């Protein structure tokens, strides 16, 4: 290589590396614009607490490297600010320095605990493509100025406290792909301008208070794939929905839609999830032009007014996995053609009018729920393919002995045969299952309740109430550590109190009422336990003995309320939501609880032979709603610590041997709407609280020393203390009267005795004999 060639070669190399070094160095030295940096720092200072996750925000570092900040590679302008889940704990100011970032394309402040209103100046960020403000505590109306953000692709304002109507200006967002306004308090109708969003893929308006009709312009949104408006008050849909060729999810549940079943909807082959439950659709179920390529997997039509029979055409949905049409008026048999639905796993037709045989192909599903129908028999099982896990056949017309073919359903987890006419014994084959629920109540089963729970370690619910079972209570239940519901009511079980159940940490409901249980509830050798107990009913048995003062002190679930995720005590079995039910005397009336509230706490020890003092530890059960100790032999005073029972609604202490006064502080219990103190030995004034004055007179009968009942009984039950002397005063007066009477009676005799004694001692006895001797002889004779 010549010298000139070398010279040019080195020049080229030098220039190349100079450009390379400059290009690598310049972003770190000159990338962040000062105005952008200063704007971000001022935005940070608007919040009392602002902690970035990793890279702190300060002037000494490049703002483009700050946590959550992204800049344009060329201009250095901030184009993205992602602070999701950063606790800002304040509101967005109208003049916030955030709005100086005019080149922002992406803004995510979701889950930041923002409150206050959305400032209208947000509409000045005209380059925004994604706006995420969901899961905060924002209030007020959606600002009209958001319609200025014409580059917006994603608008997410869900899970806030926004009010007012959806602004019509949202129709200006013609590029919008995703509109998310769920879980707010929006009202009014959807504006017709929403039909301008021709590119929209997802619309989520669920969990608001929107009403009226879905506008006809809605049919313009032909690219829509997800449509969710459940939990609103919409009343009508456009008549033709067949143009949504890309629709996958259609959820309009829990609204006020009425009219005929929208059959043309099901001609859309892409449709996979349809939920129309909890509306007022009526008439028969019909499907128009079902595509052979239909992708429908989930169809939920529960709680409508649908009638007629199950259509044969439903068997064309070969991809169907879940079918739930419960709580309608569907009648007739289950079509045999439905056996073609080989993908079906969940079949729910509870609370209808189906009848005939239960087809055997249902046993290959995972869940079959046919309660509250009129089925009377079972088709013979020909297939060995049994995958059933949840089987609910309650409230039908089955009769005869326990179906032995159930013993072959090896995968069975939950079995409900309650409220039928089954008889005979409960089979031992049930020990081979690992059941989570066994519900056999209200049949005619007899014999013993077999000890079959040694291997059923997952058992959560056991209900054999309302049968004719006898013998011992099964001790193998001690193995069921997850047991939370036990109901053996109205049988003939004869055993001592199963105090060993107190060691089960999850036990919430224990109902032993109306059996032949006997003996004491408390054994000094055993710990009391029952830390998770919420409801106990052991009434109408033969329990006896004394309860120690601390008997209830370990019942933690009645002391402190732990809010659960659900409103009712329930089981979730493969999609199926199964509520627990029971019967109990509440406010003096036998009640049936089809669902048990999570916050309900009750103790019923009535109609037994328990005696001694009422344990003071009851006063610690601050979550207690119902307390019934009637029909026992409790003595002494009513504990005075009960003013802590501020949630108590029902109190029945009738037919005991209680004495003393009714504690005046009970009159302060504002929720106490029913009480019964009758047939005791109570005395003193009735509390003057409003709740006491609203009670019936019979609630205080046969307590002869109670007073202050004039307003309750509308007559003077016992005179008031102003007109009636106290018992102590009466006793003193009676003693004084007795002394006076004695003095009057014995005074003359004593006087005569003294006189006669003086005569004898004064040697005047001859005179005495002369005057009174014959009378003395007469008296002596008479004495004989």
Curated annotation (Swiss-Prot):
InterPro entries: Leu-rich_rpt (IPR001611), Leu-rich_rpt_typical-subtyp (IPR003591), LRR_dom_sf (IPR032675), LRR_N_plant-typ (IPR013210), LRR_R13L4/SHOC2-like (IPR055414), RLP23-like (IPR046956). Residues 1-25 form the signal peptide. Residues 26-739 are extracellular. It is a single-pass type I membrane protein. It holds the Pfam family LRR_14. The chain crosses the membrane at residues 740-760. This is Receptor-like protein 11.
